[in-house]
Each structure stands twice: as structure tokens, then as C-alpha cells.
Amino acid sequence: MTDVSMQRILLDTNVLLDYLLHRDDHAKMAEAVMELGAKNNVTLLCASLSLKDIAYLSSSAIRREFKPNESEVENFTRSFLSSRVPWRCIEQVKEMCDIVAVDESTCDKAFSLQKRHRDFEDNLIIVAAQQSGANCVVTSDAELISHFPEYCKTPAEIVAALE
């Protein structure tokens, strides 16, 4: 049964990366958030600034995993994957989520949160979520959760609310 207060949730970059790149033990919980969100007609949101991080970090993950070597075939494959995987990750996010713009107003409001939380990028996520009418931000960032406990939830908390 869906928690009525969870109809619009913004996914932090770390949760999206966990899902897309199947990162460690966080991937299963991120996948559960996506599945339960879809099953319960929850609108999943993504801040536009997360897209550039997803593109960069997914390409970096490929390059880190597959180091250049003497094999022409392996080097071609590495180059091919590092150029294609980021685009596919962005496509997947766009299929799953509504993209929320980050504009000058978002930046100004994020700047005003610096006494509460010193990470400007995180503050952009918080403000983008608020401006889009999101009920919460789903994140694995413990510090962000501790600074915005009323607004930030772990993937496990969202799964519990949506089951």
C-alpha cells in the first residue's frame, strides 16, 4: 500500500548510480525503490544536474574497470563502452524519471542553505526537489540525511513506505 505522502520523490545522484551501475550492496535497495515506485504510481524525479554526474561517473567506471593495454580489440571495446554506456544511462533515467530543472532561483536558494549543509551540490538537489513539489529526497548520503532529516529518506525507508 502506497504511503500517500510519497507520490513524488526525487532520487539523489547516488541512488541513481547505485541502480544504473549495480554498485555494491546498495544496488538491490535502489532497484526496489524503482520497482515499488513504478508499481505504486509514484512519480520519480531526477535533478538535471544529476545527469552530468551520471554521464561522467558511468564513463569513468568503465575506464577504471578496463585499463588500456596492448590488445587493440580490448582498447577499442573500452573506448566503445566508455562512449556508449553514459548515453544509455541517461536514456534509462529519462525513461524512469521526470527531469527537474536547476536554474538561477535554485542556485540562489541552495546558496542560502550553506549554514545548514555545506555541500552546494547537495543543496541544489534539496532545493530542486522542493521546487518540483517532491515529498522527499531519496539518498544514501548520511550527512545529507542528518542535516535534512525531515526531508531526506534512505532507500530502505522508501521501500518500507511503499510496500
Locate each region found by the language model.
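Short, well-structured N-terminal submotif of metal-dependent ribonuclease cores
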Residues: 1-49, 57-67, 132, 146, ...
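Conserved glycosyltransferase catalytic-site signature
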Residues: 13, 48, 104, 122-126
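A broad detector of short, well-ordered amphipathic alpha-helices
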Residues: 28, 108, 126-127
